[in-house]
Amino acid sequence: MRITQYQTVWQLTFFPALFPVNCYLVEEENEVTLIDAALPGSYKGIIQAVNQLGKPLQHILLTHAHGDHVGSLDTLAQTFPHAKVMISERDSFLLQGDTSLRQDEPQTPIKGGIPKHIQTKPHQLLTGGETIGSLLAIPTPGHTPGSMSFLDTRNGTLIAGDAFQLRGGIAVSGQIKWAFPFPAFATWNKEEAIKSAQLLADKAPSCLAVGHGKFLRSPSERMRQAIQKAKKG
C-alpha cells in the first residue's frame, strides 16, 4: 500500500504498480472520514492508516457500489461499529446486488463488478447536497446511476470516485484509455458521465482525487480537455 497526502486528504493506494485502487481518509479536527472501501483484502492497510491518524473513524462514505470500492466494507463496518456508512439512495440498490434500471433512467445496462454478498446496511442514504463534516455530497451519475462525489469545502479537494480516471491519462468515465481501459469498460452511461464531469469541472477544484490514479493538482484545464475529448467520442 502506498500513502500520499494532499492537505487534509490521505490517498491509500493498493497495487499501485499494476492495478491501482484508491480509497481516501479525510482528516477533520477531531475525527476521520473514509471514502470508499477498496478491495476485499484492503482492510488491513485501511485500519492501520486510521490508527496512525489517531482519531476516531466516524463516517464511511461510498462513491459507488462497484466491488473495488466496497470490497472491505463489511470488515471495516465490524471493526469500526460507530462509523456511519453512507451511499447514494440510488446505488444502495446496487450494494444489495440489484442491477435493475428505473423507468426514468437511460436504459443502458449497468456494468462492472456488482457485489452480491455485502451484509452491511447503510445508516444514511444520500441524495446530494448533504454535508458530512467538511465534505459536500455531489450526485455524479454516469459510471453508475448513483455515483456520488465529495468536495472538501475547506480546500477544494474533490474526491470523485470513477467520474474521472487518472491512471493511463485523464479521462471522463466511459472514455476508453487503452493504457488503463477498465473504468470505461465498467461505465453505465457515458452521456450521463459527461454531464457529471462538467458539473465537477465547474466546481474548479484545487485537486482531483479519483479511484484510479494519483492526485492531480490544479486540474481544471485538464478536466475541461478530457470533457471535450469525451464529447467528440
UniProtKB/Swiss-Prot annotation:
SMART domains: Lactamase_B (SM00849). The gene is yobT. GO terms for molecular function: hydrolase activity; metal ion binding. Binds 2 Zn(2+) ions per subunit. Belongs to the metallo-beta-lactamase superfamily. Glyoxalase II family. InterPro entries: Metallo-B-lactamas, NDM-1-like, RibonucZ/Hydroxyglut_hydro. Its EC number is 3.-.-.-. Zn(2+) 2 binds at D68, H69, D162, H212. This is Uncharacterized protein YobT. It comes from the Bacteria. Zn(2+) 1 binds at H64, H66, H143, D162. Disulfide bonds: none annotated. Keywords: Hydrolase, Metal-binding, Zinc. Coiled coil: none annotated. Pfam families: Lactamase_B. Its cofactor is Zn(2+). The keyword Zinc applies.
